[in-house]
């Protein structure tokens, strides 16, 4: 069938990519993904992160993703924003958020530093240029009001509250403890997911924090994991719609 043929081609292509990356590892002496097999590492490697976000072809902790991210953060950043010196020559909010998505998925708390950096770069109307001049903080390339950047911001906020990982829904993995310490109720949704729309609330309650959700599932309810940063992960029991996680306010 045509579907089986597509699957075969995808497997063969993935095998070619893996072989190429093995050769790159031997050449560079590190598990990194440059923009091309014979290219040095530079800011163009940002495109290789698509294997983790948004495609999720590579696992969350694949060293090829994480070492590439570390390279970009150490060598291609300005005031915690991703600085793209290939053509763009500016800080890229939407690509900074791509890195943040990789870190969020891997459970790396640095994701929030990047979110804050992008928030600080927003215009008074809540918009971002496609590339931002490092001195003036105004636009220096591309769209003045970059819709892609706005979309990535929405997706970042969405994934902080709810994101898919295989056959699971991960809730609250991007809700930092500083937000919980404000002792204010938070809510998000109804947010679209591959399992159906879901509405989420987060409520601090003394020494605990309560995560609750309601979903309009397309089929049966998926496996749900509540995973606040720095707190124990909790696998929800089916059909409960609520998880209580112990939270020490002094933490």
Task: Give residue ranges: language-model regions.
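Non-catalytic C-terminal accessory modules of carbohydrate-active enzymes
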Residues: 109-250
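Active-site neighborhood of glycoside hydrolase catalytic domains
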Residues: 1-27, 59-60
């Amino acid at each position: 069938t045509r579907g089986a043929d597509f699957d075969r081609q995808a497997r063969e292509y993935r095998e070619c990519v893996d072989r190429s990356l093995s050769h790159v590892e031997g050449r560079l002496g590190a598990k990194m993904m440059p923009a091309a097999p014979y290219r040095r590492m530079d800011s163009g490697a940002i495109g290789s992160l698509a294997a983790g976000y948004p495609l999720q072809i590579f696992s969350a902790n694949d060293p090829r993703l994480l070492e590439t991210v570390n390279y970009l953060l150490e060598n291609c950043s300005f005031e915690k924003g991703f600085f793209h010196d290939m053509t763009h020559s500016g800080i890229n909010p939407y690509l900074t958020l791509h890195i943040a998505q990789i870190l969020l998925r891997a459970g790396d708390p640095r994701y929030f530093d990047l979110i804050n950096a992008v928030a600080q770069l927003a215009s008074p109307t809540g918009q971002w240029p496609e590339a931002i001049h490092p001195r003036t903080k105004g636009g220096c390339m591309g769209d003045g009001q970059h819709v892609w950047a706005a979309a990535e911001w929405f997706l970042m906020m969405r994934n902080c509250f709810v994101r898919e990982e295989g056959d699971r829904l991960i809730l609250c993995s991007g809700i930092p403890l500083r937000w919980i310490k404000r002792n204010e109720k938070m809510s998000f949704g109804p947010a679209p997911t591959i399992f159906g729309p879901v509405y989420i609330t987060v409520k601090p309650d003394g020494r605990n924090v309560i995560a609750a959700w309601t979903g309009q599932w397309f089929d049966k309810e998926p496996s749900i994991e509540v995973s606040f940063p720095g707190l124990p992960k909790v696998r929800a029991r089916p059909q409960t719609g609520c998880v209580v996680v112990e939270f020490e306010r002094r933490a």
